[in-house]
């Protein structure tokens, strides 16, 4: 049994996540964490709301509300939505917690004492109209690399490059749109140049990093590491702990990535085992796995490892950062301003949670950008989830219920075809296990579905309803192995569709908990089945039209309200 820290990217809570955010980080991390638990590993799965920084502050200024109140309201809503999506966090916290603030300040004080932080006077944008400095998302302009017109002062969301405001072409204030002036102010910098060789060694020598994360990180390293300012002049954030830094806050991305550690500290503190976090983060045998969209790669693959190195503590380096490509909606990027896409609160009003979870993992953008379309969703729900998986389970269990008195049949005397079938199922399960281990979640679920497809072919070929008329023992042998294959199917699908897997397990009447190893064990003959009912139902094109009409009605209600926390559908 191994120890794992699993973390999903911390969402900004100026709004709720959309489907792309979910599959890029939170849902993928949940699937992996659930899989690890099924295998019997010790897992701490954490994340939290990114409460600080310019997105919240800009929005709060525009709405005339206190950023702390705004962020806390949105945090509570997002946490509830994740619960409804069956995200199995051990702790979902936020960056304004006492534990996180204390941890961050003490951490950066050590980095400062170790000599990795220096000061420099810089010209920074200032808005004379709003009388505020314009760090990060307070200033927008054209990206010098890709030409994107609304690049932010810290990063271009189009090409993913890290930026500073001086690189922007035609910068403007994000609050009022006016042209900024430049003023001199002092900031504290992390000297990444001194850590560059160690970071390069970490990236180049990491066999677990996905290709997009490794290529993006090596490209940045090839350009050379520049010192990065870790303080800001905005008020909403964690006060910087450095001498002379009064009135400065820690740049949100530098403090948010430390949340993966502070959340584990907080988790064990809540359990009354305050020192146990060290058993995870200070043990080199622990595996640390992050799940992020590709725009978050630099902060997880370069910045966080650099901070851990600069701390001088014996922190375990992240094992991998599982990064996806982008999920599009009907061929285009998600856009809140254009209301293009589906947000996770809306999704829950349209289809059951397991349907969303299955479709998103089934089309997960692991190697290239992928588009969610309603046509694809229809095909996956109807042909894969209902016809392949649900139909197979129903065929096996209904036959046992109606023809065998609802009891698991004896194993009988298997034919070569029977032995070949259950052997193939075991091989598919092992293949799915390898995909889960490699965090190839899309391939894992596709492989598990093959168990159901093989099962349907097996039933058609062996026809136990005909065998039962002339050779009861042969029919028993078929149904016993078909039933056994459902154990494999339930376990393989459990990380993705936990509710449906538990329902299937209950219908099978199995009293032992659903685990990966339990699936491999032969069923107990004579065990009574539970209530058998269809696992899924089909969705028609007319259903989709009705759902989309309903979505427009829901949005009319949402956007008639003023405040973001009032616009969420609960």
From Swiss-Prot:
Gene3D superfamilies: HUPs, Isoleucyl-tRNA Synthetase, Domain 1, Methionyl-tRNA synthetase, Zn-domain. It comes from the Archaea. Its EC number is 6.1.1.10. A motif ('HIGH' region) lies at residues 11-21. GO terms for cellular component: aminoacyl-tRNA synthetase multienzyme complex; cytosol. Its main location: cytoplasm. Its cofactor is Zn(2+). Belongs to the class-I aminoacyl-tRNA synthetase family. MetG type 1 subfamily. HAMAP family: Met_tRNA_synth_type1. This is Methionine--tRNA ligase. It comes from Pyrobaculum arsenaticum (strain DSM 13514 / JCM 11321 / PZ6). The lineage of its organism: Archaea, Thermoproteota, Thermoprotei, Thermoproteales, Thermoproteaceae.
